Amino acid sequence: MADGTGKMREVLRGLPPFPEELPEFDVQAAPEDPVTLFLTWFNAAVQDKILGPQIMTLATADGAGRVSSRVLICKDVDDTGRWYFASSSDSEKGRDLAANPHAAASFYWPQQGRQIRIRGRAGSAGRRASAEDFLARPPASRAAALIGQQSKPMSELADLDDAFRACEAKIEADPEILAPDWTLYALSAETVEFWQADHQRRHLRLQYLRGDDTWTRRLLWP
């Protein structure tokens, strides 16, 4: 284990990056669109009982180009090549997207040595879709969203407890109450890359690029 005495580099180099067995990826048999391949890989991750296959990392940048990233849940994927996630429009990511809609998302399933990278533009999926997403959330999640204040300084934990109790009471009194800033976002992919690890470092990378009406595919050097 790393002990803070300069051995961190050795510890990191000694950790295995991939499992002994890795799935095959026949790039020649890949479908014409990235959504079909994404669903194939995602379903394989579910069948292999990969923990949290729906979790993705979302990177955004503010108007000055300062980048930040966070882990969140993918809420849906549609046939047009849009990946959905939800958040407060007043959160850091929401403010970033209001100033700069360009965003990137990635899925990583280390037990399979697979990564999927998505780049494009993100925007609101609309008020109705946002309301439906909010009301489908568990009560505790709705209470957290009603509190708001995400990423803002908090004086003490007791403030969080008080805010939760107050918002849980609001939900009990009105089960249809909505958080006005809750937004379902759609990341419309411009490029989607599928990466399959290889023990000999002959990693396979297949990238899809969106055209006017169709997707084109190309291999990338690892």
Predicted regions and their residues:
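Binding-site signature for planar aromatic cofactors or substrates
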Residues: 1-222
